[in-house]
Amino acid sequence: MANAGVERERKFLVDDLDAALAVAGPGEHLVQGYLDQAGDQSVRIRCWPEDGRAVLTVKGPRSGMSRPEAECEVTPEVAELLLAACGPRVVDKTRRALDVGGEGVDWIVDVFHGRHEGLVLAEAELTTDGAVIDPP
């Protein structure tokens, strides 16, 4: 199944992991590889090893806080081939939803592992153009 739409997001570096995890839901492990990145456009494969899901995503150029995005599910076999094609451009992380308020904003926190150990990012996904971001 494929879908296309508009992505609206902002990312923030997290200084206090304990505070972020205090308002976070259960985590899900994922592996993400970048097949191509040119400027602010990218093609990536994201895999959830625990349940075998995998999604290929193409993100277009930014316009303000928005950019076009298209996603399509792929089989685990295709995902494995695509991840291998990423070479060293692969990240391993645990993603958790943050239980914080905010009309029209969904928050997540990514805790990175491996060579990016110690990196923690919070991401605000805006569901509407007029959503106001108030970092927790």
Please provide the spans of the model-predicted regions:
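Phosphate-end processing signature that detects enzymes handling 5′-triphosphorylated RNA
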Residues: 1-136
